[in-house]
A protein has these predicted regions:
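A hydrophobic C-terminal alpha-helical subdomain
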Residues: 120-186
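Oxidoreductase cofactor-interface core, primarily capturing Rossmann-like NAD(P)-dependent enzymes
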Residues: 1-2, 8-115, 127-130, 148-149
Length: 186
């Protein structure tokens, strides 16, 4: 029997929640058991949902930075493929990221503009969000900081090499998530 662990992309080592993933990976490697590690990129759905609407335009703290976003369905497909043939994938670490997407590109897909806000303003808005759990503002600030400074745009062929179909359109997925998050006024 082998174990498959869904971890965090290698490009995510600067994220505040990366150490827990890397420590778990090490424990798995040291266990003596058969293993495969799927280092998942951040979701296109999350990227789009993190864009904030201000009237008819979107805002973010991402600046010109890109995220090598991946569709959650593609990650699920890869996990099923790996689980279907664990011996073939034993001892492997796959970095499952997609193509780089920017907030500006998502805004363009939506037919609207994008405005960059400062990281301090972004943190303030997160802290003022009443439904967030205590860990969420620092986690999301960490993601925004890493995207803004170019740490999460690295690509890899692993996702497409493992999929039995073309990777889903992450720009369209991010735009759909941003559109779904748009406030509706009656």
């Amino acid at each position: 029997m082998g174990y498959t662990y869904t971890s965090l992309t290698g490009a995510g080592d600067h994220l505040g929640f990366a150490p827990a993933h890397r420590a778990t990976e090490q424990l798995i490697r040291d266990s003596g058991l058969s293993w495969t590690i799927l280092r998942n990129g951040l979701y296109a759905e999350l990227f789009g949902a993190l864009l904030m609407w201000d009237g008819d335009a979107v805002e973010s703290a991402f600046g010109p930075g890109a995220l090598a976003a991946v569709a959650r369905e593609d990650l699920a497909d890869v996990a099923a493929i790996v689980a279907g043939d664990p011996a073939r994938h034993a001892g492997r670490v796959y970095d499952l990221v997609g193509v780089p997407v920017t907030a500006q590109a998502v805004a363009g897909q939506l037919g609207t503009g994008h405005r960059t806000i400062g990281l301090g303003e972004y943190r303030r808005r997160l802290l003022d969000t009443p439904d967030f759990l205590p860990f969420q503002p620092p986690m999301l600030s960490s993601i925004a900081t890493n995207i803004r400074h170019g740490f999460l745009g690295a690509t890899s062929a692993d996702l497409q090499d493992l999929l039995d179909h073309p990777a889903r359109d992450v720009l369209a997925i991010a735009a759909a998530a941003a559109s779904a998050a748009r406030p509706q006024f009656s």
